[in-house]
Amino acid sequence: MAEQDITREQLAQLLNEDLSREYQAIIAYVVYSQVLKGAEYMNIAAQLEEHAHQELQHALIISRQIDYLGAMPSVTPKPVKTSEKARDMLSFDLDNENETIRNYRDRIRQCEALGEFAMAEQIREILVQEHDHQIDLATALGIEVPNVGAGRPRSKGTR
């Protein structure tokens, strides 16, 4: 959707999709943080607990913006994938973070196109944390941090 063509109603609908993804992240991080086993996952399990708290804050911020736009915030999470394999769970989380980053980059442009600069700024702040989550997950997986903007991976250790 071209940013200049977006309406407040469409933005609220897209933010509701983002809110459903935040709910998904909360559930996934709560579950994964408790079921990851083994010394190699102790650090990331603790980080996932922190991520769950941050995702709840994101959900509250996005809900407030949806209400501000005159819509009702969603109550339904996107489906949460599970696995018996720790690497699979971390990969699911990384895929979700990559999608969230792409979506929030779009939302920032859409908010600005509507003149909603304060809303864009709040989403920028969320985006910073989502990017940190992406780095944490890629590091735990021992892979390069995906560059979701260009579709090419970035060098490990660069931000």
Report the location of each language-model feature.
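Iron-associated oxidoreductase/ferritin-like identity signal
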Residues: 1-159
